[in-house]
């Protein structure tokens, strides 16, 4: 059950929790960004923008007039934000470089994160259909949602093997 619908939290409690988490995220993000880039203000501004954009994307997932999570776009955003952006961003913060193999690693994480979202959406397919929430499983049905899930997992496994054979990790 959803936390508000189940009565575990009121709307005000949920909003306060979101605000506290946003404040903590901004504080920690700024500290890490400032530490990583010292006085390179271009990268500081870029990463602050990406941080704010990520927070807004998280809020727009389920809130607002047209939350994209209710229209089948959650998978794309999860792949981008939890996969590519989080891996690229973390890597760049630590190395100040961009390497194409990070795209493979970000895609692996992205496919697995979308897999978790897909499992939740499959579980909720009946209720989401009643609530007119247009997730991928509600659009394609239970049977094809399972095939979609197989694709997500197999794609991540194939990319793991691709990365492991192409880029041997040495001591």
Predicted feature residues:
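Alpha-helical transmembrane segments
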Residues: 103-113, 168-171
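Intramembrane alpha-helical segments
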Residues: 5-100
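Alpha-helical transmembrane segments of multi-pass membrane proteins
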Residues: 54, 58-59, 109-120
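Transmembrane alpha-helical core residues of multi-pass small-molecule transporters
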Residues: 21, 53-54, 78, 105-109, ...
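Acidic (Asp/Glu-rich) catalytic motifs at the cytosolic membrane interface
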Residues: 1, 114-137
């Amino acid at each position: 059950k959803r936390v508000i619908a189940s009565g575990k939290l009121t709307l005000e409690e949920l909003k306060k929790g979101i605000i506290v988490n946003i404040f903590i995220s901004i504080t920690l993000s700024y500290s890490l960004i400032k530490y990583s880039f010292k006085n390179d203000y271009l990268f500081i501004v870029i990463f602050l923008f990406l941080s704010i954009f990520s927070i807004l994307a998280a809020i727009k997932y389920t809130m607002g007039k047209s939350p994209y999570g209710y229209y089948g776009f959650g998978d794309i955003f999860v792949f981008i934000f939890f996969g590519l952006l989080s891996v690229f961003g973390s890597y760049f913060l630590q190395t100040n470089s961009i390497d194409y193999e990070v795209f493979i690693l970000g895609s692996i994480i992205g496919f697995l994160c979308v897999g978790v979202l897909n499992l939740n959406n499959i579980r909720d397919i009946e209720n989401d259909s009643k609530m007119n929430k247009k997730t991928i499983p509600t659009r394609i049905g239970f049977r094809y949602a399972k095939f979609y899930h197989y694709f997500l997992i197999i794609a991540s496994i194939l990319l793991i093997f691709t990365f492991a054979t192409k880029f041997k990790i040495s001591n």
